Every structure is written in C-alpha cells, then in structure tokens.
Amino acid sequence: MITLTTRTTPRLNRIKIRKLVVDIQDVESTELYGAFTREHARMIIKFIRNLPECITDLYICCSKGGSRSTGCAAALMLMSNRSDDDVWKNPYYTPNYLVFRELCREFGIDMSDEAVSDRLRINDEAYKTAQKNKNAGKYERWQILM
C-alpha cells in the first residue's frame, strides 16, 4: 500500500501489510509547502523495487482518492510498461501532475512538460465530455491493481 497524504492515523499500523506513507500536500507547485519532491519519488521507487515478486496487488490512496494517488498510479503504470490511459481518460480523476511528472522523471521515463500537458488536456476533455453527457460529478475512489 502506498499512501500519499498528510492525514495519517495510528489505525494504519493495525494493517499488517507492506506500506509506505508519503507525507505530502495536494499541491502542484514545487514552491509550495509539502510539495512532492524527487526524494519522495525515490522513496516510492525504492518501495516498489523492494516488494517481493509474490505481491501482485498494489493499493494506492490519498485523502480523497482522486489526485495524488492517481498521479502516482499513472506513473507506476508507465513504469510497469502499461498504458496510463485509464487514469487520464477517467473524468472522475484529476491526477496531480507534479507527482506524476517527478515519479516518471526519477524513474527515467522521458516525461517532458509538453507530454504532461497533453495528458492534462486528455483528462480535461474527458471531464468536459462527461459533463456534457450529464455523467460528471460522481465520486469514485481510486484503486489500482497492478
């Protein structure tokens, strides 16, 4: 389990699974307090690399399940040679592009600002289409099984 939030609870320790808590705010500027950094990205990559091969499911969450976790999930999908379309084309998610970009870059995936902008446009179009079809605004938590 990867948790990207400033809100932690002692109850999390009751869960006897491998977990990484990354203490970050949901901000998309490196200038803001609590922003995701390359050090955070290295922590996540190290955590993923150290998982035993028998681990087949990965739960990624944040406070509300739509931004930091989806940015992380999209990057991890690319890292595992999968498409990240399921994240960017989902109108219920607004992936945190700082989390996504820094994770990709730290892993060695060529992720230019233009490539990130293209994905943000795809996500924005998905939301506008859902709104037009009166299918936006529903809340859905993110869970990715890898």
Task: Report each predicted region and the residues it spans.
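Lipid deacylating catalytic domains
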Residues: L12-K16, E39-H40, S117-R121
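Short, glycine/charged-enriched secondary-structure capping and boundary segments
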Residues: R14-K16, A73-M77
